[in-house]
């Protein structure tokens, strides 16, 4: 039997309390449901350091719980090591992408492929908007986008 190669993905947004923890939790559930979680290293992080150590926004936790998904994530900032250890760094908007590309240019031997998670959306919604100043419906929109994008991403790289 061929040995499975472990792949890794880091989901990134501005503060790591709304969008990226939702994407991380959605992707964890997808790979768990498909019995391939042992083949993946999955995490999420922030381009900023504002929320380091904080739990996800209660509205994000509630949205995930409504879909039967739990998370124990604590916010962290993206590190230089992430660019060397992760295969994929998937972010939510153009600002995240700019910040990550800038940081990656300072890293020797960057191996991560840095992309917008929305680039995998079959509905072609490239940007996953920050729901922080929005309402529960905005968090649900983020969740639905993450489900579509994570499914398509997994299908492509599996």
Curated annotation (Swiss-Prot):
Taxonomic superkingdom: Eukaryota
Enzymatic reactions: O-phospho-L-tyrosyl-[protein] + H2O = L-tyrosyl-[protein] + phosphate; a phosphate monoester + H2O = an alcohol + phosphate
The protein's role, per its UniProt record: Acts on tyrosine phosphorylated proteins, low-MW aryl phosphates and natural and synthetic acyl phosphates.
Active site: 13, 19, 130
Family: Belongs to the low molecular weight phosphotyrosine protein phosphatase family.
Lineage: Eukaryota, Metazoa, Chordata, Craniata, Vertebrata
Keywords: Acetylation, Cytoplasm, Hydrolase, Phosphoprotein, Protein phosphatase
PTM notes: Phosphorylated by LCK. Phosphorylation at Tyr-132 increases its phosphatase activity.
Name of the molecule in the record: Low molecular weight phosphotyrosine protein phosphatase
Annotated control of activity: Inhibited by sulfhydryl reagents.
SMART domains, A to Z: LMWPc
Effect of residue 67 to E: Decreased activity
Subcellular location: Cytoplasm
GO MF entries: acid phosphatase activity; non-membrane spanning protein tyrosine phosphatase activity; protein tyrosine phosphatase activity
EC assignment: 3.1.3.48, 3.1.3.2
Phosphotyrosine: residues bearing it: 132-133
């Amino acid at each position: 039997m061929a040995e499975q190669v472990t792949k890794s993905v880091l989901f990134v947004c501005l503060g790591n309390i709304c969008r990226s923890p939702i994407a991380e939790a959605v992707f964890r559930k997808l790979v768990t449901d498909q019995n391939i979680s042992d083949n993946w290293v999955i995490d999420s992080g922030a381009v900023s350091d504002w929320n380091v150590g904080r739990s996800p926004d209660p509205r994000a936790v509630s949205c995930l719980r409504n879909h039967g998904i739990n998370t124990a994530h604590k916010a962290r900032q993206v590190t230089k090591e992430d660019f060397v250890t992760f295969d994929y760094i998937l972010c939510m908007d153009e600002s995240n992408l700019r910040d990550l590309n800038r940081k990656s240019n300072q890293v020797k031997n960057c191996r991560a492929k840095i992309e917008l998670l929305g680039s995998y959306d079959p509905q072609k919604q490239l940007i996953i908007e920050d729901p922080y100043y929005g309402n529960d419906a905005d968090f649900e929109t983020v969740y639905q986008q993450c489900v579509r994008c994570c499914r398509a991403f997994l299908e492509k790289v599996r």
